[in-house]
Amino acid sequence: MARGPKKHLKRVAAPKHWMLDKLTGVFAPRPSTGPHKLRECLPLIVFLRNRLKYALTGDEVKKICMQRFIKIDGKVRVDVTYPAGFMDVISIEKTGEHFRLVYDTKGRFAVHRITVEEAKYKLCKVRKITVGVKGIPHLVTHDARTIRYPDPVIKVNDTVQIDLGTGKIINFIKFDTGNLCMVIGGANLGRVGVITNRERHPGSFDVVHVKDANGNSFATRLSNIFVIGNGNKPWISLPRGKGIRLTVAEERDKRLATKQSSG
């Protein structure tokens, strides 16, 4: 009989997008409980050791973290299995580097460097708006933040821009047709495009149709949509490829073209 929460995670059962080799060990780091779900996060240890190659072993990552060099969303994190997730800003004081966790078109977290200015804020999707004790309205975001007294114009599925220094909302983008969005779940994970229309299905899932910069259209559930810009101007910098997924043939042609130009 299982007593309490699970404490281990086998390597083969770890999320595919962590890109851990199957044969390098038996276990994978199990993320701590935190603002992002286990299968939608990237533990700090995987980011520092496997992505940035700043450490060779888990022990070395622990030594880096215990020196309080690593900040996530402006807060020092010493837990090596802390679950960083979509839109989180990871800052390394010592090297003066800042990263934002965003998806590439293959659905993996890209190592995306950002400027100091951009590291001061993050975008959050509004998941829920409720009225709490003594009639105080508050909203809950995708990364489990509770913000009291929001602007009454802000509704569920809108995106709020949060100042990481104060934790306050400084701006917001309405969920509306014609706005730029990124897909954060499903088969189109990581694609960026403009919302063309929304199909309402009462009692089921609303479907949103999106068109990318190349003119390709695709559809996904409303819950997978994260608005990232007004019109077609993103409020954050996008990783290489700008969220445009190429077909296998297009990827091949691109590779051949770069080969010929360099050769």
From Swiss-Prot:
It comes from the Eukaryota. GO terms for biological process: translation. The keyword Ribosomal protein applies. The keyword Ribonucleoprotein applies. Residues 42-104 form the S4 RNA-binding domain. Keywords: Ribonucleoprotein, Ribosomal protein, RNA-binding, rRNA-binding. Pfam families: 40S_S4_C, KOW, Ribosomal_S4e, RS4NT. GO terms for molecular function: RNA binding; rRNA binding; structural constituent of ribosome. This is Small ribosomal subunit protein eS4, Y isoform 1. It comes from Homo sapiens (Human).
